[in-house]
């Protein structure tokens, strides 16, 4: 059973912020698969299909790990079958990269997941949100995208949803996916 979780913050006020790009990608993936989040459990929303689960935590980003840990335990999901989609401040807007494992790189939602799962050996799909205005990081990640950024944003969401779909539906190894998409 594979698990894809998009990170973001719940609530209308955060809907179009940089921090919620993980939610946006989940929405696009659900559209492609003609699915909707239909289960509410463990303080999150998800849909369980035959061999995968797609989910969004309903906690604030920095507390996402508890929801993921509960899904993993309940459905007996292997750590190697988890893909977490999140914003990446280290990448320019529009850059999309897969990562096998490793540190949180300052991303507090990922840090909480590492803490809750007791491992950093889960897969990530990191989506760049950086622009040149990084005076206050906390304010920046909770800011909305500027009109001139929307084309790059839509392109990143489309690319990331294709990668997430490939993770779910193909039999390619993660190394092969990284070689194919991390260019």
Curated annotation (Swiss-Prot):
Gene3D superfamilies: Peptidyl-tRNA hydrolase. The keyword RNA-binding applies. The active site is at residue 19. It comes from the Bacteria. It is an enzyme of class 3 (hydrolase). Hydrolyzes ribosome-free peptidyl-tRNAs (with 1 or more amino acids incorporated), which drop off the ribosome during protein synthesis, or as a result of ribosome stalling. Catalyzes the release of premature peptidyl moieties from peptidyl-tRNA molecules trapped in stalled 50S ribosomal subunits, and thus maintains levels of free tRNAs and 50S ribosomes. Keywords: Cytoplasm, Hydrolase, RNA-binding, tRNA-binding. It comes from Mycoplasmoides gallisepticum (strain R(low / passage 15 / clone 2)). It is found in: Cytoplasm. Its EC number is 3.1.1.29. Belongs to the PTH family. GO terms for biological process: protein quality control for misfolded or incompletely synthesized proteins; rescue of stalled ribosome. The record marks 9 as: Discriminates between blocked and unblocked aminoacyl-tRNA. GO terms for molecular function: peptidyl-tRNA hydrolase activity; tRNA binding. Its main location: cytoplasm. It catalyses: an N-acyl-L-alpha-aminoacyl-tRNA + H2O = an N-acyl-L-amino acid + a tRNA + H(+). This is Peptidyl-tRNA hydrolase. The gene is pth. Monomer. Pfam families: Pept_tRNA_hydro. The record marks 87 as: Stabilizes the basic form of H active site to accept a proton. TRNA binds at residues 14, 60, 62. One of its GO terms (cellular component) is cytoplasm.
């Amino acid at each position: 059973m594979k698990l894809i979780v998009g990170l973001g913050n719940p609530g209308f006020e955060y809907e179009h912020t940089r921090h919620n790009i993980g939610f946006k990608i989940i929405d696009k993936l659900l559209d492609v698969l003609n699915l909707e989040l239909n289960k509410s459990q463990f303080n999150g929303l998800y849909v369980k299909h035959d061999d995968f689960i797609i989910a969004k935590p309903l906690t604030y980003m920095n507390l996402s790990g508890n929801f993921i840990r509960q899904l993993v335990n309940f459905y007996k999901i292997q750590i190697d079958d988890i893909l977490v989609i999140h914003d990446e401040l280290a990448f320019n807007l529009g850059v999309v990269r897969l990562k096998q494992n490793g540190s949180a790189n300052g991303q507090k939602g990922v840090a909480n997941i590492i803490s809750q799962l007791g491992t950093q050996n889960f897969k990530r799909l990191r989506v760049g949100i950086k622009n040149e205005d990084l005076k206050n990081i906390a304010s920046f990640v909770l800011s909305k995208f500027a009109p001139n950024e929307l084309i790059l944003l839509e392109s990143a969401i489309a690319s990331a949803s294709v990668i997430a779909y490939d993770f779910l539906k193909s039999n390619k190894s993660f190394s092969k996916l990284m070689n194919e998409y991390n260019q």
